[in-house]
UniProtKB/Swiss-Prot annotation:
Contains 3 disulfide bonds. It comes from Terebra anilis (Auger snail). The keyword Metal-binding does not apply. Keywords: Cleavage on pair of basic residues, Disulfide bond, Secreted, Signal, Toxin. It comes from the Eukaryota. Expressed by the venom duct. Residues 1-21 form the signal peptide. The keyword Cell division does not apply. This is Teretoxin Tan6.14. It is found in: Secreted. Residues 22-60 form a propeptide. One of its GO terms (cellular component) is extracellular region. The cysteine framework is VI/VII (C-C-CC-C-C). Has the PXY motif between the first and the second Cys residues.
Length: 96
């Protein structure tokens, strides 16, 4: 029980520090956001977990943007929309 508590505290502290310095990159591309995160959290042992937590999220906690490191949720596909890779539903993906 104690190791689980330590792990949960470590993750919450790591995420708190990582979200604190995150600028608003609304217009930036996914590649530049990922590159900024890589530089900022390079030494973080929980980097891969933090990386997925820092992407823009939809209401169902699915990533809005996708890349080679960030995968879409089940039922969504990664598609180039206006030069940006975004997760779209399979129905939208097949329709266009």
């Amino acid at each position: 029980m104690r190791p689980l508590l330590v792990f949960v505290l470590m993750v919450s502290v790591s995420l708190a520090f990582s979200l604190e310095g995150m600028p608003n990159n609304g217009g930036d591309s996914v590649a530049s956001i990922t590159a900024n995160q890589a530089r900022r959290f390079k030494r973080n042992p929980l980097f891969s977990f933090a990386q997925h937590s820092l992407v823009d999220l939809k209401a169902r906690a699915c990533p809005y943007y996708c890349s080679s490191q960030i995968r879409c949720c089940l039922g969504f596909k990664c598609k180039d929309v206006d030069g940006t890779l975004k997760c779209v539903s399979k129905g939208d993906f097949l329709g266009k």
